């Protein structure tokens, strides 16, 4: 019976993936009607815990794999020993040999039980990944849902105008947000709690208010874009945020726990947009450029100037890089563009705020790192790029940059 059930689940996983790759309509229906069930049940369950459940599930998974490898090595060793003793055992028939053989037999029975458990665990991982991640890659895009088809005919003038708007917003908001005596950005929660400096015990005052505000902003965005409506779990800080920094990762959506997780070691102005970005994945928008765009909208439409500033900062680099790329790859088109509209200058304060991790944190992280940050970053880049391409995102990590096209499309229509 268990074998039949195992292969039935395997068949279901294959069928779901075949359907997903061949029918966007099926994926859209699944995200609209089935996917929210997992968020509202399992997501609420894992949301009870104040820590990232997904993080510890990954640790447990690594331990299970390590145990499987260790048991495999031991089984191989015992197998060779048994092979070498086979003839002597039958010739001698000694008690000691029989006892050793009996003990080996018990170990192999335990090993079989463990591998049976490991097989079912691996099957569960494949099923959860299919239901909570892989199907999402083949659904209709956010822009197709709400903006219509993109004709792709955007001019360099439109790009620079959009860049100027974002740069000028950043310049303005950089002067409006509250700052400490040292000039560091300060988040002020609705109850007046200030969060600024991260010490050995974390952020002073905690980031719970910011996480709740991110969820509220996403729910408000759902009034205009129905697929974003509904309940959101509170984003959670990751215990292994130092390791996240070494990967240059700001956050993770864990399909195994239905959680939005963020790196709480990075600069505080990265955190609001990251929270909203990861929450966007919990509404079925798995593409990174779409999550970037949704996060941007949620932040800039906030009444909190800190969230607004964080939202504009989150896309500034993408726009700046595209303008720079225009200048480097097509100087003639760039000259024609600047004859119409000059790119705006970015203030020194914005450049100071526009960082991933502070120098002090980098010194601390690299000072205690077991593996060099460059090695971890390179490995993470390969993993993320490969994962995206396997799931049908042909340009891999470069797809993050497509948020610029979504911004151009949005502002043209609005």
Task: Describe these PLM feature segments.
Residues 91, 95-100, 104-258:
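Contiguous, non-catalytic segments that form substrate-binding/exosite surfaces or channel walls
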Residues 5-21, 122-130:
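Hydrophobic alpha-helical membrane-insertion segments
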Residues 286-333:
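Post-HExxH zinc-binding segment in Zn-dependent metallohydrolases
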Residues 254-275, 282-286:
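Short pre-active-site segment immediately N-terminal to the catalytic Zn-binding motif
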Residues 349-414:
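Pan-zinc metallopeptidase signature
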Residues 12-82:
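Membrane-embedded alpha-helical segments of integral membrane proteins
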Residues 2-9, 53-60, 73, 111-122:
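Alpha-helical transmembrane segments
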Residues 50, 273-292, 296:
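Active-site recognition of the HExxH zinc-binding catalytic motif
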């Amino acid at each position: 019976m268990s074998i039949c059930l195992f292969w039935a689940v395997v068949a279901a996983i294959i069928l779901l993936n075949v359907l997903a790759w061949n029918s966007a309509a099926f994926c859209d229906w699944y995200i609209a009607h089935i996917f929210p069930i997992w968020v509202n049940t399992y997501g609420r369950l894992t949301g009870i815990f104040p820590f990232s459940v997904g993080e510890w599930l990954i640790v447990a998974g690594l331990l299970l794999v390590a145990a499987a490898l260790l048991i495999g090595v031991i089984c191989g060793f015992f197998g060779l020993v048994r092979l070498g003793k086979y003839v002597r055992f039958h010739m001698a028939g000694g008690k000691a040999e029989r006892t050793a053989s009996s003990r080996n037999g018990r170990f192999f029975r335990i090993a079989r039980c463990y591998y049976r458990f490991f097989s079912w665990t691996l099957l569960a991982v494949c099923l959860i990944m299919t239901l909570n991640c892989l199907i999402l890659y083949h659904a209709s895009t956010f822009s197709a849902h709400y903006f219509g088809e993109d004709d792709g005919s955007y001019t360099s003038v439109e790009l620079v105008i959009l860049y100027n708007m974002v740069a000028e917003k950043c310049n303005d908001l950089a002067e409006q947000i509250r700052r400490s005596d040292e000039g560091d950005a300060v988040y002020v929660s609705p109850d007046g709690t200030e969060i600024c400096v991260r010490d050995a015990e974390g952020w002073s005052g905690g980031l719970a208010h910011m996480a709740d505000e991110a969820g509220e902003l996403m729910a408000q965005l759902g009034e205009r874009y129905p697929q974003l409506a509904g309940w959101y779990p509170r984003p959670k800080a990751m215990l292994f945020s130092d390791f996240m920094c070494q990967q240059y990762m700001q956050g993770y959506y864990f399909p195994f726990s239905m959680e939005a997780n963020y790196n709480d070691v990075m600069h505080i102005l990265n955190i609001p947009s990251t929270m909203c970005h990861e929450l966007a994945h919990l509404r079925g928008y798995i593409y990174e450029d779409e999550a970037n765009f949704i996060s941007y909208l949620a932040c800039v439409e906030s009444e909190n100037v800190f969230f607004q500033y964080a939202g504009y900062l989150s896309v500034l680099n993408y726009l700046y890089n595209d303008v720079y790329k225009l200048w480097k790859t097509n100087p003639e088109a760039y000259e024609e563009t600047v004859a119409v509209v000059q790119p705006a200058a970015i203030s020194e304060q914005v450049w100071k705020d526009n960082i991933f991790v502070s120098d002090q944190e980098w010194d601390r992280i690299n000072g205690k790192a077991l593996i060099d940050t460059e090695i971890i970053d390179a490995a993470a880049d390969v993993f993320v790029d490969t994962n995206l391409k396997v799931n049908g995102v042909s340009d891999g990590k470069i797809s993050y940059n497509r948020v610029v096209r979504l911004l151009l499309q949005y502002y043209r229509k609005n």
